[in-house]
Regions:
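Catalytic-site signature of metal-activated, phosphate-bearing donor transferases
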Residues: 56-63, 69, 74, 80-166
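Alpha-helical solenoid scaffolds in eukaryotic macromolecular assemblies
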Residues: 4, 8-12, 30, 72, ...
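Short, well-formed alpha-helical segments that are part of the catalytic scaffolds
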Residues: 1-23
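Conserved donor nucleotide-binding strand/loop of the catalytic core
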Residues: 36-61, 65
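Conserved beta-strand positions in the Rossmann-like core of class I SAM-dependent methyltransferases
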Residues: 25-28, 47
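A conserved acidic beta->alpha catalytic loop
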Residues: 16, 20, 28-40, 51, ...
């Protein structure tokens, strides 16, 4: 993950994925708060990357540091529910594809939003009192060393890279 001044969220994010992954890569792009201290105490692989006004460049640097078979990308202000860990592990173990799409939930009180879904009672802790969420399907897991790279200075995606793979 790439971070800058994420001390408010980083610990919660790391706690949500520690039991799910074998390696955590944190790339700091210039934090001036306690972000790096939090990362260090969590035994992550921490790297500095000078900010270049390019989110894709920072993400691609993080990919270059990963050594495991699969890469899960997540932002510091996001979490993965522990109840979903077994499902994700099974998807990875049984996948015949190099990519896995997960549902990302954007929690909101605005029930008029397009695609709004009421919070499932199994996820009330994650919803933090919000009325529900809007879902986005996004590639969040992919095999390492297959040439996938992020593209886009802002709102970076794997789309161009995935198209090249066919």
């Amino acid at each position: 993950m790439i971070v800058k001044n994420e001390e408010q969220w980083l610990q919660q994010c790391l706690d949500s994925v520690k039991a799910l992954v074998s390696e955590i890569i944190v790339v700091d792009t210039g934090s001036t708060d306690k972000t790096k201290e939090i990362a260090k105490k969590n035994v992550v692989k921490l790297f500095d990357f000078p900010w270049q006004d390019d989110f894709a460049a920072a993400r691609n640097f993080s990919i270059s540091k990963a050594s495991c078979d699969w890469i899960l990308w997540i932002d510091a202000d996001e979490t993965i529910a522990k109840k979903d860990h077994d499902i994700i592990k099974k998807l990875v173990a049984e996948s015949q594809f190099p990519l896995i799409v997960l549902e990302q939930r954007h929690y909101t009180h605005d029930t008029t939003k397009s695609l709004f879904k009421k919070t499932d009672e199994r996820y009330t802790a994650e919803a933090r009192g919000f009325a529900g969420y809007t879902p986005t399907l996004t590639t969040r897991l992919f095999k390492n060393k297959i040439g996938l790279q992020f593209d886009g200075v802002v709102h970076e995606t794997l789309d161009k890279s995935m198209q090249k793979l066919g």
